[in-house]
């Protein structure tokens, strides 16, 4: 058994490294968002086809966590993360050589499977080294660091697109993956306690998942964070086409618009890191779920009005999107911390199940937005409004009564 004196601690340097591993989601998604319309033309695909490259990544990212979580509980966090990063580098290079929309969809599927290992096990490593409110604080700080990625990724992607073309974006992702792999190999410790190692046996894995499914409060936290994530994925799927094609924003400038939204998310992360240890993750979560339940439906109604009567401008929507996206930083880390506190002996499995639900629902909402896109903002705002309302319902029905 590892003694307390020899166990790794959650140092600022380790937290930054874990934030880098968590950043592969926004990097893999947000950096190529400005290029979606260009990719559609270059690969002779429709808007719906190219938006499937986003949904394919998210579906694979979610499903892959079913395997990474239990594998991390059996073999340890470090080796599983290293293998995932190595595969990510290879698949990113493959995306750069895609010749058809179908090829890119398939490669993004594999890229999503590779990327999810670091993300799900980075959360698990925080849980290995911190408890409840401190874990919520650490996850918020990690999310604040990670939020730099979605703030800069569209800006960088837009510039790469302008000067080098969209394929260079995936070469840059491959380079980032290689740097992360090298850093993880040199600096990432193993945090799984020997006594918490779980057998990688199908019956045992199913038994652990069954235990989680039967816990009403756990499922409540999982659905609460998942519907919040679905609102974000609806925004990510629809905003490039809405802002660039409908509102005439240049692809290079799209990153500025998206970065403005991420500022709200960063502020939310910093506030949560400051106040979670003071008020508790559960109390903050109880109030935070009301924000998307109010702003989401308002944006939905505004979207219907614009679709029927003509454009009303983008600013009324920004006033709704900003607060809704900011609360992702409050709802996500606090839901995760509250859900994982009861399961230190299978934190990887619990984290993976929440990840599957988050990215599964997110991919479903994003795919619907892509397939129903009609040139207006209404499909995107409708999805965000429904997800925001269901976020509140999940918390009130499952968590409060669980």
Which positions does each model-derived feature cover?
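Helix-breaking motifs and short loop linkers at transmembrane-helix boundaries and internal kinks
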Residues: 42-44, 76, 97-103, 114, ...
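Helix-loop-helix hairpin linking two adjacent transmembrane segments in secondary transporters
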Residues: 99, 103, 141-186
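Juxtamembrane intracellular "pre-TM" segments in multi-pass secondary transporters
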Residues: 2-7, 189-221
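Paired small-residue
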Residues: 87-94, 102-110, 315-320
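C-terminal ends and interior cores of transmembrane alpha-helices
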Residues: 86-99, 292-309
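Conserved MFS/SLC helix-loop-helix module at the cytosolic interface between two early adjacent transmembrane helices
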Residues: 63-102
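Cytoplasmic helix-loop-helix junction between adjacent transmembrane helices
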Residues: 107-148
């Amino acid at each position: 058994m590892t003694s307390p004196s020899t166990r790794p601690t959650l140092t600022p340097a380790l937290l930054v490294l874990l934030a880098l591993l968590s950043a592969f989601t926004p990097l893999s998604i947000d950096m190529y968002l400005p290029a979606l319309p260009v990719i559609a033309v270059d690969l002779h695909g429709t808007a719906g086809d190219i938006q499937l490259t986003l949904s394919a990544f998210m579906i694979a990212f979610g499903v892959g966590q079913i395997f990474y979580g239990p594998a991390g509980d059996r073999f340890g966090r470090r080796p599983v993360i290293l293998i995932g990063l190595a595969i990510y580098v290879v698949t990113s290079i493959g995306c750069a050589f895609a010749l058809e929309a179908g090829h890119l969809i398939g490669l993004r599927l594999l890229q999503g499977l590779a990327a999810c290992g670091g993300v799900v096990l980075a959360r698990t490593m925080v849980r290995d080294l911190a408890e409840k409110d401190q874990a919520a604080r650490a996850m918020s700080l990690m999310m604040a660091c990670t939020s730099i990625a979605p703030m800069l990724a569209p800006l960088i992607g837009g510039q790469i697109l302008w000067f080098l073309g969209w394929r260079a974006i995936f070469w840059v992702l491959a380079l980032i993956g290689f740097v992360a792999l090298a850093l993880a190999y040199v600096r990432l410790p193993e945090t799984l306690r020997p006594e918490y190692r779980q057998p990688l046996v199908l019956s045992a894995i199913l038994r652990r998942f069954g235990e989680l499914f039967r816990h009403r409060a756990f499922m409540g936290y999982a659905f609460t964070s998942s519907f919040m994530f679905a609102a974000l994925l609806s925004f990510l799927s629809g905003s490039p086409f809405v802002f660039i094609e409908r509102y005439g924003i240049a692809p290079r400038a799209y990153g500025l618009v998206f970065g403005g939204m991420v500022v709200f998310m960063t502020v939310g992360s910093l506030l949560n890191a400051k106040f979670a240890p003071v008020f508790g993750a559960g109390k903050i979560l109880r109030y935070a779920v009301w924000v998307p339940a109010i702003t989401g439906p308002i944006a939905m109604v505004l979207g219907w009005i614009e679709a029927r009567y003509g454009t009303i401008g983008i600013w009324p929507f920004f006033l709704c999107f900003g607060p809704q996206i900011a609360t992702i930083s409050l709802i996500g880390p606090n839901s995760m911390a509250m859900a994982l506190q009861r399961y230190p002996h299978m934190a990887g499995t619990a984290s993976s199940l929440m990840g599957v639900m988050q990215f599964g629902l997110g991919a479903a909402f994003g795919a619907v937005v892509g397939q129903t896109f009609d040139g207006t903002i209404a499909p995107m705002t409708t999805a965000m409004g429904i997800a925001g309302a269901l976020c509140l319902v999940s918390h009130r029905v499952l968590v409060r009564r669980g």
